[in-house]
């Protein structure tokens, strides 16, 4: 497990790299004992920074839902993350200038008619709260 100072430093590094549009070396290569929970702690710290800058959480995503993508990423489970307001684009062309190494991965988007609150949310709760399911990139 990473300590709080390391988590904060890595979140700051990620934030600066995104701002400057540069890639960072995989954190897990520099911190071989890093866990999935550490990765989510870094994500939470990075999101807090973005929220402090005025960004707003507009949704959530689940990635690496296919076994092939999990194997390519050397991860054995789907991942999840919040989607911030500046991660949404109007229909039409999207400028590549904003991205470091653009790639497209098609996922399913569940548009909710009402919020889900946990713990204890069931599959039936998700289905009942879902307004529409649509492809997303």
Specify the residue positions occupied by each region the protein language model found.
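Active-site microenvironments in enzyme catalytic cores
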Residues: 2-137
């Amino acid at each position: 497990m990473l300590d709080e100072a390391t988590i904060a430093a890595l979140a700051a590094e990620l934030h600066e790299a995104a701002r400057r549009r540069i890639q960072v070396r995989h954190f897990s290569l520099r911190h071989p004992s890093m866990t999935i929970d550490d990765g989510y702690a870094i994500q939470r710290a990075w999101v807090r920074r973005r929220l402090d800058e005025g960004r707003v959480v507009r949704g959530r995503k689940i990635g690496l839902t296919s076994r092939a993508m999990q194997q390519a990423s050397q991860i054995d489970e789907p991942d999840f993350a919040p989607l911030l307001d500046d991660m949404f684009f109007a229909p039409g062309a999207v400028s590549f200038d904003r991205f470091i190494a653009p790639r497209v991965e098609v996922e399913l988007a569940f548009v909710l008619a009402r919020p889900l609150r946990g713990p204890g949310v069931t599959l039936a709760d998700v289905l009942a709260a879902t307004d529409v399911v649509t492809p997303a990139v």
